[in-house]
Amino acid sequence: MAIDKSIPKATAKRLSLYYRIFKRFYADQVEKASSKQIADAMGIDSATVRRDFSYFGELGRRGFGYDVTKLMNFFADLLNDHSTTNVLLVGCGNIGRALLHYRFHDRNKMQISMGFDVDDHPMVGTKTADGIPIYGISTINDHVKKADIETAILTVPSTHAQEVADQLIEAGIRGILSFSPVHLQVPKGIIVQYVDLTSELQTLLYFMNQSQD
């Protein structure tokens, strides 16, 4: 199947949502789904669904709908969800601890397999209730290379985010999900996704205010 390499970022961000929808359809024993059904489940319009799917070649036939099992497996392959992806976390503050207890693997084959913080943090040398070990940041290079991990979640204060990101990249990390509200300078080939809770909340409040006008 031919896949267009120049997929827009907006489409790429919807891939995991499509996968989730098709898994839900499959669980509900739905065999075929129309673009309208998919769009309604996603909260978008049918044209967007068809445009997104066009980047991946022939996923369905007009008038016949989309084969749910086929599409579920397609997105599983695309998102590499057939094998477990181990992720590390740096920063065991409030957000970090919440993520350490979040069961990513209940929905997808991702799991936080180790956590890090400053060497004198009280959690260093312990394990979470789920058995995730917490190590000192000074040991991150050795642990990352031994575990062959390429993905990290960053939940450190903004004043330390760049320094820690540099350490992660030096250790071999290729992708970072950052909760720190600063833009990270990274080499070409390193992927960073940002989660800014304050910005998201402000955007929500803006739209709420607009809806009242």
UniProtKB/Swiss-Prot annotation:
Family membership noted in the UniProt record: Belongs to the transcriptional regulatory Rex family.
Q: Which InterPro entries match?
A: CoA-bd, NAD(P)-bd_dom_sf, Rex_DNA-bd_C_dom, Tscrpt_rep_Rex, WH-like_DNA-bd_sf, WH_DNA-bd_sf
Pfam families annotated for this entry?
A: CoA_binding, Put_DNA-bind_N
Under Gene3D superfamilies, the record lists:
NAD(P)-binding Rossmann-like Domain (3.40.50.720), Winged helix-like DNA-binding domain superfamily/Winged helix DNA-binding domain (1.10.10.10)
Describe the protein's quaternary organization and the partners it interacts with.
Homodimer.
Which SUPFAM superfamilies does this one have? NAD(P)-binding Rossmann-fold domains (SSF51735), Winged helix' DNA-binding domain (SSF46785)
NCBIfam families in alphabetical order: PRK05472.1-1, PRK05472.1-3, PRK05472.1-5, PRK05472.2-3, PRK05472.2-4, PRK05472.2-5
An example GO biological process term is: negative regulation of DNA-templated transcription
Protein name, entry field: Redox-sensing transcriptional repressor Rex
- The UniProt gene name for this protein comes to rex
Give the molecular function GO annotations: DNA binding; DNA-binding transcription factor activity
